Amino acid sequence: MSRLDLKNGSVEMVHGSGGRAMGQLIEELFARALRNQWLDQGNDQAQFELPPGRVVMATDSHVISPLFFPGGDIGSLAVHGTINDVAMAGARPCYLAAGFILEEGFPLADLARIVESMAAAAREAGVPVVTGDTKVVERGKGDGVFITTTGVGVVPPGLYLSGDRARPGDRILLSGSIGDHGVTILSLREGLGFEADIGSDSQALHGLVAAMVEAVPEIRCLRDPTRGGLGNTLNELARQSGVGMQLVERAIPLREPVRAACEFLGLDPLYVANEGKLIAICPAEQAERLLEVMREHPQGREAAIIGTVVADAQCFVQMETLFGGSRMVDWLNGEQLPRMC
């Protein structure tokens, strides 16, 4: 059998048949890019040891369109997204699993580019992809490639973060500017040109999280504001904890190109997706220390205290506007920007 044509070839139904062609796809494309001691064993599962602590598991499916964008692609995004979900528990991400749904006819050159990007992101994060699966669907029944990743990590003993732990008086911190990812994807998808000045913020945040929890283990909760953006995520946390939140608009980091793009498109940046930012809630007396630690890290240089947790049985999130008024930051109704991740 000749080698895969990674320049001009495409995915065929036989690549999902479980036979020789599938083995060739796995060996010459997936295993070569993602190679590590677990994948080299060739098993249908991975066996590994974990350090002491509570085990955390998270899974995330990625259907983003377009597949490639300034600042990343579906491969790196699949790694970053699941690592971040694990890290938001205060955990150290240890291992990843990946499942691919491929559409018949998808160019092998694009698939190789995606898998190599995934491998590079995993290496940079120090979190290997140790097992995986591939399926092929008929032409027209997919959209190129969908990726599901599952991550396993460990929370150090004595640390407990959860979305139901926010208390009145706590401070709300944000690690950086919002809306970059969502505006980048929408601009590229619609051919608007904003992506020339804006790129996705997709990145793995476990290094920032490790620095934060080491310095301030009293952190109540962490959450990454992905789909639905900052507004939806804060409503989720308010509902989980049975509290309200009071935000200050002028304190929320927002880059000028993103602000201008949202204004042009009629979007509220509070609801635009992010892929490399986190929200932290901590006791008021720890907020300045936590802010200092975040700003010392490359991924938190734009960090800010953006609000306060308040007692509110209705769990409303409200915001003091730039003009001194007040507005409700409600749950997002409908889908403002589909297929952002």
Swiss-Prot record:
It comes from the Bacteria. One of its GO terms (biological process) is protein maturation. InterPro entries: HypE, PurM-like_C_dom, PurM-like_C_sf, PurM-like_N, PurM-like_N_sf. NCBIfam families: hypE. Belongs to the HypE family. PANTHER family: CARBAMOYL DEHYDRATASE HYPE, HYDROGENASE ISOENZYMES FORMATION PROTEIN HYPE. May be involved in the maturation of the NifE hydrogenase. This is Hydrogenase expression/formation protein HupE. It comes from Azotobacter chroococcum mcd 1.
